[in-house]
Every structure is written in structure tokens, then in C-alpha cells.
């Protein structure tokens, strides 16, 4: 049995621990407590955690830019997978976005993360081949 609730900054340490224990998830300076606090404040009630018997078993962060939604860091620990947790987390995010009038959502998957790519394809998400994403880091710090 699991319980999904809104993520708060009090969950930060446990969420970072989940991410560190999950292959394919990259943590950057942008995942700092301060940056996470700003993200949660800018996108209230849109990121979620999953409570399981032993603590947190999963999480997802969700936000938008006013036009498009974005999912980041969907994580479910291996022992809790195949129970519908990831699907329920994503549905909460998409419903939250829809309440804000946002019907299209994007996410990024590292090309080396085949497990995640397989999951998203199995859920009906489409791999975009018509665009390339470019990034620029003003500070020059590639960990930002």
C-alpha cells in the first residue's frame, strides 16, 4: 500500500537520497535545497512523494513555464516498482498541469538511461526526433 502526497521542502533530504540511489538520475547544483525551495514555491502543489511502509519510496517534480509542463526526477525504488506508483505520480502531475490550463508536458531522459526510455514509451510518451535541445550555462559551471 502507498500514499501519494504533495512534496514539501521537509522531504528534501529523503528525496535526494532516493535520487542518489537510483541509476540514471543525475544530481546537479540546481538540485540544491535552495533551488528546490524556489522550484516548489514557484510550482506549489505540483511535485509529489510516495509514502511506503519504510519511508519514501518514490517522488516526482513537476512545474511549468505558463505554456508547457515539465516533469523531472520521477523515481520509484526498485522494490516498489510494478505497483502503479509511477503511473499514479505522473497522473497527479498531469492533472495539476491541466488545472492550470497546460495540456502538453515535456521531460528529459539521458540517452544512456534505457530503462527510463522504455518506461516512457510504454506509457504512450513520444520521443521527439524533430528537435534538439541546446543548453547554455552562464557561469560556465557544467554542474549548474
Predicted regions and their residues:
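Conserved active-site alpha-helix within GNAT-family acetyltransferase domains
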Residues: 87-88, 99, 111-130, 136
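Short aromatic/hydrophobic contact patches that present stacked aromatics
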Residues: 75, 106-108, 135
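Short, charged/polar, Gly/Pro-enriched secondary-structure boundary elements
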Residues: 141-144
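Charged, low-complexity surface patches
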Residues: 8, 86, 109
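Active-site acidic-Proline motif in GNAT/NAT acetyltransferases
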Residues: 77-83, 111-112
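Glycine-rich acyl-CoA binding loop
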Residues: 50, 82-87
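Acetyl-CoA-dependent GNAT
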Residues: 2, 6-73, 77, 90-92, ...
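Conserved GNAT acetyl-CoA-binding A-motif
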Residues: 97-109
Amino acid at each position: 500500500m502507498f500514499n501519494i502526497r504533495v512534496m514539501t521542502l521537509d522531504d528534501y533530504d529523503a528525496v535526494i537520497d532516493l535520487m542518489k540511489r537510483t541509476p540514471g538520475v543525475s544530481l546537479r547544483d540546481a538540485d540544491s535545497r535552495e533551488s528546490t525551495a524556489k522550484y516548489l514555491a514557484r510550482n506549489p502543489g505540483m511535485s509529489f512523494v510516495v509514502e511506503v511502509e519504510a519511508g519514501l519510496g518514490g517522488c516526482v517534480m513537476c512545474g511549468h513555464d505558463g505554456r508547457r509542463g515539465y516533469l523531472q526526477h520521477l523515481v520509484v525504488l526498485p522494490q516498489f516498482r510494478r505497483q502503479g506508483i509511477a503511473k499514479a505520480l505522473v497522473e497527479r502531475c498531469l492533472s495539476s498541469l491541466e488545472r492550470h490550463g497546460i495540456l502538453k508536458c515535456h521531460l528529459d531522459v539521458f540517452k544512456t538511461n534505457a530503462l527510463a526510455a522504455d518506461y516512457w514509451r510504454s506509457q504512450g510518451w513520444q520521443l521527439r526526433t524533430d528537435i534538439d535541445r541546446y543548453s547554455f550555462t552562464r557561469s560556465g559551471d557544467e554542474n549548474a
